[in-house]
From Swiss-Prot:
It is found in: Cytoplasm. GO terms for cellular component: cytoplasm. It comes from Xenopus tropicalis (Western clawed frog). GO terms for biological process: protein processing. Residues 85-205 are annotated as: Peptidase C39-like. Residues 1-26 are annotated as: Disordered. The active site is at C93. This is Actin maturation protease. The gene is actmap. InterPro entries: ACTMAP. It is an enzyme of class 3 (hydrolase). It comes from the Eukaryota.
């Protein structure tokens, strides 16, 4: 008799048992790409950060770590307003910088990043979150913040330099497009790494003047009631205090370095041109939209 694996009891009853059903497949686990997962993690960190750790103390620590590079014969006069960090998702650097700038305008009603993005998309200023037009950035700020904005053209020197420094010493933000190096600092790539930063403050190296000294860092000081006006400061060196959407940290950039970077934005990155995505680039390209352009913001009541 041929061998069988059937249950004898089932054979006697004349019943043939069906094989057990196959096990269900394991549930699919959808993993975010590493860059997206990292971005979302740092965005969460930024949203829950304590201003005391991201503000003055962090900036002072950075200045102290770089103190050996500064001219020890100068007094270092710091103007800065705390600005919260926000990590961008995708090419949202300009809109994230705008959101950060809005925090310095004492707005009656906060404008969430999503509101800013939706406004930019609906008006045809952006497709992916990119902003290749400083003029559109100035108009967008008026619409979402209800503030005043001023578009500067012709670079960061000359008359514009005075306007930028006056803005920063008044505690108001400046948005600057520039080419971003791998450490997020300004570089010169002819616009291939175009990026946006918000400038929240300025560090002057000055010869003399009456200022309030920092209790912890020799040579670092702050403006006082009897400090000389900006026009009367004997300024020898200038650094800008910056934040941008790829880092939680403040950065300190030489004025001339970011000025040179801002003034050579002329081409769209060829990799971006061929990546299959749609981007909104103004007539005249990156050169017409960003090169040598800066945006200043003020509350309407100023």
């Amino acid at each position: 008799m041929p061998h069988t694996n059937e249950d004898p009891t089932a054979q006697q009853a004349g019943v043939i048992l069906d094989p057990p059903p196959p096990l269900p497949p394991p549930p699919q686990i959808h993993l975010l790409p590493p860059t997206v997962a990292k971005c979302k993690f740092f965005k969460k960190v930024a949203e829950n950060s304590d201003p005391s750790t991201g503000g003055c103390e962090e900036l002072k620590k950075m200045i102290k770590n770089r103190q050996s590079r500064f001219n020890g014969e100068l007094k270092w006069l710091l103007y800065n307003q705390y600005v919260p960090s926000l990590i961008q998702e995708g090419p949202q650097c300009g809109l994230v910088a705008l959101w950060m700038a809005g925090k310095l305008l004492n707005l009656a009603h906060e404008a969430p990043l999503q509101t800013i993005v939706e406004a930019a998309v609906s008006r045809g200023y952006t497709a992916q979150g990119e902003m290749f037009s400083a003029a559109n950035m100035a108009v967008l700020a008026k619409e979402v913040f209800g503030c005043r904005s001023e578009l500067l053209t012709g670079g960061m020197d000359g008359e514009n330099k005075g306007k930028i420094l006056q803005q920063l010493t008044s505690g108001l933000p400046v948005l600057i497009p520039y080419d971003e190096d791998f450490n997020h600092e300004p570089c010169q790539r002819e616009g291939h790494r175009a990026h946006w930063a918000v400038i929240s403050g300025v560090l002057f190296g000055v010869r003399c003047g009456s200022f309030s000294p920092d209790p912890d860092i020799p040579g670092l000081c702050y403006p006082s009631s009897d400090s000389p006006s900006l026009e009367d400061l004997n300024i020898q060196e200038i650094y800008l205090v910056a934040k941008q959407g790829k880092s939680l940290r403040y950065q300190l950039w030489e004025y001339d370095c970011i000025s040179r970077s801002n003034g050579q934005l002329i081409h769209l990155d060829p990799k971006r041109s061929n990546d299959g995505n749609v981007y909104i680039v103004p007539s005249g390209g990156v050169k017409a939209g960003l090169c040598g352009q800066i945006v200043l913001f003020q509350p309407k009541d100023v």
